[in-house]
Amino acid sequence: MKLLVLYRPNSEFARTVEEFIQTLRVQQNIDERQLEILDFDSREGSATASLYDIIAQPGFVVVGDDGGFIKSWQGNELPLAEEVASYTLSY
C-alpha cells in the first residue's frame, strides 16, 4: 500500500501539507516505503494527478501495491491522519 501526496511546495497549503505528512510519519507510523511525495506541477506529479483524476491540490491518493486506486482526497480540507493511515495500513 502506498500514499501519494500531490501538492505545490511553494503554495499557501505547503506548510499545512508538510505538517500533515510529519503527523503521518510520527503519530501513524507511515514510513518512506508507504509514502510518495510529488510536486503537483512536475511532470511526474502532473501525470499522477491525471491518472487518478486529482484536479485540486493538495491531493492524497491511496493505491495498492499494483498501483490500483483505493481512495483519494483533494482540496484544501485535509483528511484526518487516522483515516489516511487506516486505508494505508489495512490494505
Regions found by a protein language model. Give the residues of each.
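Non-catalytic, surface beta->alpha helical segment in thiol-disulfide oxidoreductase systems
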Residues: 62-91
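Short, well-ordered coil loops that connect the C-terminus of an alpha-helix to the N-terminus
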Residues: 30-31, 54
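Short beta-strand-centered segments that line the small-molecule binding cleft or hinge
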Residues: 49
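A short acidic, often aromatic-flanked loop/helix-cap motif at beta-alpha or helix-coil junctions
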Residues: 42-46, 78-81
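Local sequence-structure signature of Cys/Sec-based thiol-disulfide redox active-site neighborhoods
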Residues: 1-30
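Thiol-based oxidoreductase modules, predominantly thioredoxin-like and allied folds used
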Residues: 7-8, 31-45
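Surface-exposed, flexible loop/turn segments at secondary-structure boundaries
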Residues: 11, 43, 68
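Structural micro-motif
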Residues: 52-62
